[in-house]
Design a protein with these regions (language model features):
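Carbohydrate-binding surfaces of carbohydrate-active enzymes
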Residues: 1-262
Length: 262
C-alpha cells in the first residue's frame, strides 16, 4: 500500500511555529483520490512533549488534512519508559483514532487550488518556493483552505466542467492561485487557460509567469500571454483584491470580539 506521507518532527511543528508542509501530503491524497494522508509523528522530538503539546501537533496536522498517524516510539528501554507511556496517552490515542476516522468518511472541501511551481524550482529559482510559503501562510491565517496542484495534476488528473476543476476525490476547485513562477508546462497552461474561459477564477499572486516549457527549458519554450480579466496581486499580502478572486467562505471562526484570531 502506498500512502502520501510526511514526517512531523520538532523543528517543523511545535507551538508558536509556522510550517504548513502537511499540506503537501494531504493535497496529493485529495488530488489523486486517496482516502488517507499519512504522518509518522514524534520521531525526532528530543524534548518530550507534554500531552497538550502532543495534541497540538496532531491537531495542527489534522487541520491541514492529515488523517492517518503512526506515533514513532520505542516501547521500552534500558533507562526509563518513553513519554508515550505517561498517563492520559490512551485518551489521546482514542481522540486521534476517532477524529481521523471521521475525516476519512467525508470528502475534501477546499475550493481553492494553489499551483506549485515545480518547473521553475528545477531551474534553481528557489525564491519562488519561499513566495509560495508566504502566500499559503496568508491563506491559512485568513482561514482559506486549499490544495496544492502541479503540472502533472493539471495534465493527468484534474478535469474541467462548467468552470470548475474536479479531482479524483470528486472535489472541485473554483479558483486557481498561481504564485510567483517563471515557467509553467505547456499542457498545464492550456488547462489553466480553458479553466479561465469556462468561468473559473485565476489569481496571479506575486511575480507573473513568463514562459511555457515542454521537454526542454532551452529550445522548447513559448511566451505566456496573460489574460486581461484575471486577478493580479503583486504584493505577498492578503488584500481585498486577493479576497475577490476566491470563493465565498462557507465557515469563518471568530473570537469573542467577532474578529478572526491572529
Amino acid at each position: 500500500m502506498c500512502l502520501p506521507t510526511r514526517k512531523a518532527e520538532e523543528p517543523q511543528i511545535w507551538p508558536d511555529t509556522i510550517n504548513n508542509y502537511p499540506k503537501y501530503a494531504s493535497s496529493v491524497s485529495h488530488v489523486w483520490g486517496k482516502r488517507r494522508a499519512f504522518s509518522e509523528s514524534f520521531a525526532a522530538y528530543y524534548n518530550s512533549p507534554t500531552l497538550p503539546e502532543a495534541k497540538y501537533i496532531l491537531d495542527y496536522q489534522m487541520i491541514r488534512g492529515i488523517n492517518f498517524f503512526e506515533f514513532m516510539f520505542w516501547s521500552s528501554g534500558s533507562k526509563h519508559q518513553g513519554w508515550l507511556s505517561q498517563l492520559g496517552m490512551k485518551g489521546l490515542n482514542e481522540y486521534a483514532n476517532r477524529a481521523t476516522w471521521l475525516m476519512q468518511q467525508g470528502k475534501p472541501g477546499a475550493r481553492v487550488a494553489v499551483y506549485y511551481p515545480v518547473s521553475t524550482i528545477w531551474t534553481g529559482k528557489e525564491k519562488v518556493a519561499e513566495d509560495v510559503k508566504t502566500i499559503v501562510n496568508e491563506l491559512i491565517k485568513n482561514q482559506i483552505d486549499f490544495d496544492y496542484i502541479t503540472d502533472d495534476a493539471l495534465k493527468e488528473t484534474l478535469t474541467l466542467k462548467n468552470g470548475r476543476l474536479f479531482n479524483r476525490s470528486q472535489q472541485y476547485y473554483e479558483s486557481v492561485i498561481i504564485p510567483s513562477t517563471l515557467f509553467i508546462q505547456k499542457d498545464a497552461w492550456h488547462k489553466i487557460e480553458e479553466f479561465k474561459k469556462q468561468g473559473g477564477k485565476i489569481l496571479f499572486w506575486g511575480d507573473t509567469p513568463q514562459l511555457t516549457n515542454g521537454r526542454s527549458f532551452v529550445n522548447d519554450t513559448e511566451p505566456i500571454l496573460l489574460p486581461d480579466d484575471a486577478y493580479y496581486e503583486p504584493e505577498l499580502k492578503f488584500t481585498e483584491n486577493v479576497k475577490a478572486a476566491l470563493p465565498r467562505q462557507e465557515i469563518i471562526l471568530v473570537n469573542e470580539k467577532g474578529l478572526i484570531p491572529d
